[in-house]
Amino acid sequence: MLRRLVRLATVAAAAAIAVPALAQAEVMAPDVLVKNVTLEVVDIIRKDQDIQAGGAVAKKKMVALIETKILPHFNFQAMTSSAVGRNWGKANAEQKTRLNEEFKTLLVRTYSSALTAYSDQKFDFRPLRAKPTDTDVTVNVRVIQSGTQPVTIDYDMEKRPSGWKVWDVRIAGVSLVANYRTEFDNLVRDGGVDGLIKALQTKNSSLDPALAASPAGAQKK
């Protein structure tokens, strides 16, 4: 049940942070950005026959969508360092770069699966509770699907010189970053930082070819 709720919520998480090129010309308010882009991306998914058909072509299209529209709007360094937690300080510069790359690849897989699984969920966009001068806000969305309880998504976002960036996503109150931190702590305890990197590489290499063949896009500062 929890896995199903996470999948439903991740659909909205993936869609809401995919920013179209036109939106990048100006800094849009975070709640407006989430609403506008969620509706636009969902409309694309509904109308794309290749995506609706599923299979390898759909997966490749999802990867391209994620790399061009979603990845640039994450603050991956903040997400990775927070997910690795206290062990981040144990990593050297090369290890930090590799951790960042593997974590991006892991999220590509997560969002590819979620977007492919989209099936007419509805979205309730909650009013933003923040001051105009705030540079760190939380945008709230509820995902609604017939026959299930609504799932709440909280996007923790920070204002950067190039616009608003997501640094954590909380699904039904569960932090994506904190959830990975627990797993990563165990891996570092058992095999050190290199053990964590190897575990991430193994997990990412197990992806099907459509997802593994395309590397994660570079982080946009």
Label each PLM-derived region with a short phrase.
Residues V27-L107, Y111:
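Early exported N-terminus immediately downstream of N-terminal targeting peptides
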Residues A53-G54, F123, L196-I197:
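Short, hydrophobic secondary-structure boundary micro-motifs
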Residues D168-K221:
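Low-complexity, intrinsically disordered terminal/linker segments enriched in charged
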